[in-house]
């Protein structure tokens, strides 16, 4: 996958960024380099490799100490929302940012 100048202009527009031509050219090179690395990684055959849950597990047996998934703090929604400019039915209201 290779991007072109129009792709960079579209991405910048979607992100509401104003890029100079120099910045646009630099971004094009950096993103294409990144996608080149991703393509190389995708080309590697990993069909015989077991998934890892921890990088150290590849070289030694480890026992993960996982805790139970329980709430450890009381509900503080009301306290957290006191300083919010707008709240409705327990949710923060924010301005619309996507047209």
UniProtKB/Swiss-Prot annotation:
GO biological process, one term: translation
InterPro entries: Asp/Glu-ADT_sf_sub_c (IPR036113), GatC (IPR003837)
EC class: ligase
Keywords in alphabetical order: ATP-binding, Ligase, Nucleotide-binding, Protein biosynthesis
Signal peptide range: none
Subunit comment: Heterotrimer of A, B and C subunits.
HAMAP family: GatC
Protein name: Aspartyl/glutamyl-tRNA(Asn/Gln) amidotransferase subunit C
Species this chain originates from: Delftia acidovorans (strain DSM 14801 / SPH-1)
